[in-house]
A protein has these predicted regions:
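Conserved catalytic cysteine-centered active-site region
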Residues: 39-47, 74-129
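Phosphate/pyrophosphate-binding loops at sites that engage ATP/ADP/AMP, CoA/4′-phosphopantetheine
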Residues: 52-68
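Flexible, glycine-rich active-site loops centered on histidine and acidic residues
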Residues: 122-156
Length: 219
């Protein structure tokens, strides 16, 4: 707008070297909406992640030996321990000492990972970073909660970011947290709030995805 200074200076010089995606073969139809959903015991979260990573490496004409850090940025991991990145590392980088870590802020995990890792690339800590988001959220959805059950697809996407000597990259990033909505989108069970040993038919909804969509929109 007139009189306002527009921020255009590149702060973090990173570029996309390659990317890849993987969607489950199975689809589910909700009226005119198509969702990709895994079939339980046929495709896993790790399968999707591995396929997306291999596609990204091929797209970039690189191998895992060219990657300095592997980041898993998924809303929900494979299991509490170890981190999902370690399990993905076992699939795609076994025998290599590439550091692997999770960056998790649920639905905004990829954005958080890119923001964080772009700083480390700019600082010279890493030259090339692979970020993968892999989701099979359908396995934890409550079929009785229509607003969430019909909303999500499963799938994976992987991007390889690398340092750049060109004037392009991240201009700015901004994140905010409104914790008054912390309990409007949650899976309560599985860790220390509701431990796995507490699972029963009566408590099973605590181990499913629960979303108060309209309330979130009004935050």
């Amino acid at each position: 707008m007139k009189g306002q200074k527009i921020m255009t200076e590149v702060k973090r010089h990173v570029e996309i070297a390659g990317y890849g995606v993987c969607l489950p073969k199975n689809t589910v139809q909700f009226k005119d909406q198509t969702r990709h959903r895994v079939v339980e015991n046929e495709e896993t979260q790790l399968d999707l992640a591995e396929a997306a990573i291999q596609a990204a490496l091929e797209n970039a004409n690189l191998s895992m030996k060219d990657i300095d850090c592997l980041v898993s940025a998924s809303a929900v991991g494979v299991q509490p321990i170890p981190c999902t990145a370690a399990l993905i590392h076992e699939r795609v980088a076994k025998g290599l000492s590439i550091p692997a870590m999770d960056i998790n802020t649920t639905c905004t995990s990829f954005i958080s990972a890119l923001s964080t890792m772009s700083h480390l690339i700019e600082a010279g800590e890493y030259r090339r970073v692979l970020i993968v988001s892999s989701e099979v959220g359908s396995l934890g959805l409550n079929s009785k909660q229509k607003e969430s059950y019909e909303l999500f697809s499963d799938g994976a996407a992987a991007f390889i970011f690398q340092s750049s000597d060109k004037d392009k990259g991240v201009i700015a990033s901004l994140q905010r947290t409104w914790s008054e909505g912390a309990h409007d989108t949650e899976i309560r069970g599985g860790l220390t709030a509701y431990q796995p040993k507490e699972y029963s038919e009566e408590t099973k909804t605590n181990f499913m995805f629960d979303m108060k969509g309209k309330k979130i929109l009004l935050l």
